[in-house]
Curated annotation (Swiss-Prot):
Keywords for this protein: Cell membrane, Disulfide bond, G-protein coupled receptor, Glycoprotein, Membrane, Olfaction, Receptor, Sensory transduction, Transducer, Transmembrane, Transmembrane helix
Membrane topology category: Multi-pass membrane protein
GO molecular function per UniProt: G protein-coupled receptor activity; olfactory receptor activity
Gene encoding the protein: Or7d11
Species annotation: Mus musculus (Mouse)
Gene3D superfamilies on file: Rhodopsin 7-helix transmembrane proteins (1.20.1070.10)
Name assigned to this protein: Olfactory receptor 7D11
Length: 331
């Protein structure tokens, strides 16, 4: 097969989840439903946190940011997959692939950082409650999130610039449902040693460091829980951490599963399933996990629904509050 320079490559072939034509309508309906549920669930959390003054706390500020990132995360991959399923065309342009790699890495990294920051927030709230408002002040949270955005922007940009130097064959097939960086590197025809080294170093750092922070936070939290004499206090403290633990387990478990399965089990289908867990299932379930046992969020959602049902001007009020909150954060 003739090797073409990357500047002449105009498209890749995304093999998707299945080659069976009869399954395409079923998969299309399934993933469209999951995508819409994810958008609705996470948007409701953002609106609930923004519209209720009782939720203007660091914990819920981080939760609303996580919901925004989850919307962006799933929107990086699923819409293109749905278009390909509907049109029965598996093409993705070279520019689209680079763009998908760029934004996918940004949002995956932001998910990582936010989960770590949320674990630290829970640690401060339980282990240092008297200093909570001093340590977890809104300005610090906003600065940390901005710093994470800057870090992930440059990391993703370097990934894309290195990938842009690779050569690919005409008609290259990517055995995945989106342009995952590791899969794109595997199908290149040029020396990708630098790309692989950078990818594994970044993946290790972005996986090990945040995970270490989460483990250290929860080790201190559990130590404090064991020292509590009141059962009610233990239950209340654990209930604030249970949802976050579920999300962390789902995200990191499936994320690490992708890389372990890539190196140990050479099964493309298993790798796709593992990728689905943290790219689709995790963003979809997060709103349900966080609201299932959270009375404050459920109460805010109830008030939001009541206001929408009773007042036609409610949407304008919410929009104005969102704009006002954005201006305050900038200032």
């Amino acid at each position: 097969m003739e090797i073409e320079n990357h500047t002449l490559i105009t498209k890749f072939l995304i093999l998707g989840l299945s080659d069976d034509p009869e399954l395409q309508p079923i998969l299309f309906g399934l993933f469209l439903s999951m995508y819409l549920v994810t958008l609705l669930g996470n948007l409701l959390i953002i609106l609930a946190v923004s519209s209720d003054s009782h939720l203007h706390k660091p914990m819920y500020f981080l939760l609303s940011n996580l919901s925004f990132i989850d919307i962006c995360f799933i929107s990086t991959t699923i819409p293109k997959m749905l278009v390909n399923m509907q049109s029965q065309i598996k093409d993705i342009s070279y520019i689209e692939c680079l763009t998908q790699v760029f934004f996918f890495n940004i949002f995956a990294g932001m998910d990582n950082f936010l989960l770590t920051l949320m674990a630290y927030d829970r640690f401060v709230a339980i282990c240092h409650p008297l200093n909570y408002t001093v340590i977890m002040n809104p300005r610090l949270c906003a600065l940390l999130i901005l710093m994470f955005w800057i870090i992930m922007f440059w990391v993703s940009l370097i990934h894309v610039l290195l990938m842009n130097e690779l050569n690919f064959s005409r008609g290259t097939e990517i055995p995945h449902f989106f342009c995952e960086l590791a899969q794109v590197l595997k199908v290149s025809n040029s020396d990708n040693h630098v790309n692989n080294v950078f990818m594994y170093v970044v993946t290790s750092l972005l996986g090990v460091i945040p995970m270490t922070g989460i483990l250290m936070s929860y080790s201190q939290i559990f130590s404090s829980l064991f020292r509590m004499s009141s059962t009610v206090s233990k239950y209340k403290a654990f209930s604030t951490c249970g949802s976050h633990l579920c999300v962390v387990t789902l995200f990191y478990g499936s994320g690490f599963g992708v890389y372990f399965s890539s190196s140990v089990v050479h099964s493309t289908q298993r790798r796709k399933v593992a990728s689905l867990m943290y790219t689709v299932i995790s963003p979809m379930l997060n709103p349900f996990i966080y609201t299932l046992r959270n009375k404050d969020v459920k109460g805010a959602l109830g008030k939001l629904f009541n206001r929408v049902a009773s007042s036609p001007s409610c949407i304008n009020d919410i929009r104005n509050k969102l704009l006002l909150r954005s201006v305050r954060q900038i200032l």
